[in-house]
């Protein structure tokens, strides 16, 4: 029965940092802070990591 407690605490510690990455970027300041740039479309090797407003996307 003790193994269940150890397994639960291990999973809790392992999965808790993932909650921080579930928030979306939806403003230009947070886009720039996360190393992205605001463009109309993501061109080339850049991929969308959020939005900077209605028509613009945050690309990194």
Swiss-Prot record:
Pfam families: Defensin_beta. It comes from the Eukaryota. Most highly expressed in testis and heart. Residues 23-25 form a propeptide. GO terms for biological process: defense response to bacterium; defense response to Gram-negative bacterium; defense response to Gram-positive bacterium; innate immune response. Its main location: secreted. Keywords: Antibiotic, Antimicrobial, Defensin, Disulfide bond, Secreted, Signal. Disulfide bonds join 31-58, 38-52, 42-59. Residues 1-22 form the signal peptide. It is found in: Secreted. One of its GO terms (cellular component) is extracellular region. Coiled coil: none annotated. Belongs to the beta-defensin family. A synthetic peptide displays antimicrobial activities against S.aureus, P.aeruginosa, E.coli and B.cepacia. The antimicrobial activity against S.aureus, E.coli and B.cepacia is reduced in raised concentration of NaCl, but its action against P.aeruginosa is independent of NaCl concentration. This is Beta-defensin 8. It comes from Mus musculus.
């Amino acid at each position: 029965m003790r193994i269940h407690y150890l397994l639960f605490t291990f999973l809790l510690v392992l999965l808790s940092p993932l909650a921080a990455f579930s928030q979306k970027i939806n403003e230009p300041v947070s886009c720039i802070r996360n190393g992205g740039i605001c463009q109309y479309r993501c061109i080339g090797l850049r991929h969308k990591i959020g939005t900077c407003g209605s028509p613009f996307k945050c690309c990194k």
